[in-house]
Amino acid sequence: MLTIEDPFAEDSFDSFASITRRLGKETLIIGDDLYVTDVARMKKGIRMEATNSVLIKLNQIGTVSETEDAIDLAGKAGWDVVVSHRSGETDDPFIAHLATAVSSAFIKTGAPARGERVAKYNELMRIEEQLGRKAQYAGGRLIR
């Protein structure tokens, strides 16, 4: 198993820390609802070693600056970042660029079954084509 996202309720920091201690060396324990892209909640998670990665949703916390702060904090903590879409997403491919810019371990945008999702995957392919040989797959610490 490569990843587990939100295995417990959104305030169960102790339970998250327990599973991260048990499985965190070989599995990404991803905090989504636990952190909601909020730096204050992430700081608590870092202190408690609750997870080893975070799901980042650009429009969840409110501003690009706050999102950047969350990504920076995750990097300082040694966490992997997973950039994610939100329900009700548009066909704007910006999160493909964000995921590339921050060397996101993964991008979460769902199956390529609807236009708004396909737009993101197509943009990732365009980015890879444009970068050529400089393109690198971050892939998270477990895939490197």
Model-derived segments and spans:
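Catalytic core of soluble alpha/beta enzymes
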Residues: 1-144
